[in-house]
């Protein structure tokens, strides 16, 4: 069946497309031959991302799932949701816009098309003018922003004329979609009228009547031992048996009694009996108690004094939490004074109400604490945005500095990344009606005089509050098998419990983080059933920058056959030279089907154990090892192993249940002091990604044949294997710290060149006795994403023994592994970033410290907690658990650990500066490298170089066809070629160029004039034939080319690896570039590699040779004397051509004689 899944997926998409093809234009109202329904957009008119619509709405990114062929071009909304996930397009779009890949509107190219926001777009070849076929279109949709409810109306009258009843009240959603507001429009409340006359349970008895009932879970699993009572009478009247049934005699069948059931670990349930003659029946469903978890956190707000603000908090759980408390700067706010529930509304704000707010939610199972939100209250006349820009240094090209003085920097200014007060600050909405932030109000053009040329630049002259796009977290990545690296194809993706899409053929996925999310819990379900469900908590950048993750799925163990008629034991842990950590004992006769009926016969069991004694298993371990403690805060766990249980009848897809199952853990495997007593058994809640306690452990000695010279001691716990299948042997740990890490663009560790979006992972290691660098096992792991001030990672630490806990720290950016500071021959404080004597106490060692042949992709340290009162340990890099804010706000001069990019031989220069890690810094300008702040298109050209060394290759990008930018510089890109490990003397460079397309005003297309120049004595020897033919067929041609360079007007189409061009479109510029570079290295349009394949998918080839000693480089010669340099190049090429002709002449003569 697994092999049929790809075919099934294709059939589903084909059905979606077929539905569009069969549609006729008369079925629903639609726009034809226009680019935008409801609003006519003609040639030359803009359709910018920020548009003044009546409704609060925004555009999605562009989609293109079909290419013209056959009947035409079909961009079905159903197919878009299938490929990209339902979360990428709202349920009811307001409008739709379509453009060709040349960015032209349908009316501009004279084609008849059909647009319908609820169905999509289609263009039929048979409807076009004679001799014309449909162009290739991409589409985007206009979606309403999240709407909010109005105030509740008054309560209605109590239902019924006597006895208990209920009353209702309603609220209105102002959105035109009606159901766009989250939650219910109706709320019910119990009410009581005077007692009804006649018989009641207290006064009436029916001795011949019988109440028959059952108590089950939502899945139909019967519950044994549930206590049953009548709602109006205290005391237990019955207890459910093994089949979940009970009977109560004497209950009148026509009394419609309310029956209540309770059971430990489950929420109370109630149902009304239904009469059937002298018998009444009832089924009571009990949900398992679940601690509350937050689905909506309060968000930071900026207001002016006198305005109002609303903070919102929403929790879920079983039962649903109804009690909320709000805190200001850690102090509980009076419920009566503020009248709050899940929402806290503050009116007429005063400056003293500024500060930190958070909420707590309760239910029967416990409490949970929300994240914090900061309220900033501005005094009258106080500006929210300082008009003076802050310092922001950009690096100028290497040939623009003074000789021998190092790189030169220029202050181009930046506006602080702060929010501004909402213009509708008095609205009772949870979210602000419009997003306003401090951004660029005015740019100034300046010129930088470099040796031999002038470099234009635009600097920030003034900041101000402007309308801005709300930040969107974006996560992209790839799911692969942990053992083989094969992609997990067409795996279902669940966000909590909601399906949002599938992985692609290469295992790729894209997830847009929902607003107000703090923990992104994602589950990947393998359709073949060969891999464990991969439950991951993926860190992301809430400011909107994209983050890339590689998710490793663990393959299930091979099945073993069990027999239900006998007890079965399955070992936990199968490492060589290591005893099992424990075992599962499944008793005989304990297996059941999902409906509770006993099962007998063979059982196919697959028990997969994640063994922390295998250090490589940390990469594929599920979740992030956290639970909610008694105070409602997230707390870490230290694991001794996780196991997944899959029980099925042979040849059946139905999962079997079993219980109680004994979990036996060898006490000799628990080495940390106090952990034997604290060990507990936990199960994973896949919706929240949090672990929940199942049972404790008790000591028990071995007996029978297990007795040896020394009696083995086991810790034994019990668990029911029902809906949840993933369990954990964990200990809550209170010795916690934070570790500060920063990432840099190169190993010079310049503060102004920090890299954001790097995923830093810390794995806690438990050392073997006497060997701090030789860990026995890993205990937990955590990841964080670097921001403008680095990242703080939680870890276990110890104040008394520095090596009680050690850690392995690694960092990745896309598919690139970063390198930490070296430790050979000894760690240097100025290089590592940590002052002495704390550095010696931490025992810093890079992974290649003992063996230079090892990879240099991480470092190990002792997690020595800073000692109070010691000034040398007061400023990092390890901070106490309660000092998170100090860690996050520490200046760059404070101690921290460092990583640097290995691929550091790159340089980027934009005429209009833009911080790719902060999408809010985008500025609308015709010379902006990225013209659209909602969609970033990265383009790369693969340049092959035949030469004895690696060479720097420059891309010069200027306006090519747009009348307002023609000849003006957009930016420069430098990239050093990378050697092909299998081809000596050959290297290749993946060089970025500015994509052609619409500029930011969306009025007219510009074909970027791109010039590629290697640095050195190089000449162009070959151009990809397909690329050359494409450029010939898409005029205008470029002017006469320099033989030492390659020039083109960049293509409008995303051509692909066959042309040597790599194009990726994404909502994050950083992710788009990382994915495109990975494909360029691999030489394919869907692969990913960090090993250069120089002969695969190249666009242009240069031949380079080493210049004579003392001869200046080509760049320098072109700057000093362009005419002389070009003359030298022509002469060298002529001499090379003559030498080649002389070498090939005799060969042609000999061939001619053979033919004679």
Curated annotation (Swiss-Prot):
The keyword Disulfide bond applies. Glycans are attached at residues 276, 308, 329. GO terms for cellular component: extracellular exosome; extracellular space. Residues 1-20 form the signal peptide. May be cleaved into 2 chains possibly by a furin-like protease upon or preceding secretion. It comes from the Eukaryota. Its main location: secreted. Residues 1134-1156 are annotated as: Disordered. It is found in: Secreted, Extracellular space, Extracellular matrix. SUPFAM superfamilies: Carboxypeptidase regulatory domain-like, Immunoglobulin, TSP-1 type 1 repeat. Residues 146-197 form the TSP type-1 domain. Expressed in articular chondrocytes but not in knee meniscal cartilage cells. Localizes to the intermediate to deep zone of articular cartilage. The keyword Transferase does not apply. Keywords: Cleavage on pair of basic residues, Disulfide bond, Extracellular matrix, Glycoprotein, Immunoglobulin domain, Secreted, Signal. Residues 292-376 form the Ig-like C2-type domain. Disulfide bonds join 158-191, 162-196, 173-181, 313-359. May play a role in cartilage scaffolding. PANTHER family: CARTILAGE INTERMEDIATE LAYER PROTEIN 2, CARTILAGE INTERMEDIATE LAYER PROTEIN CLIP. This is Cartilage intermediate layer protein 2. It comes from Homo sapiens.
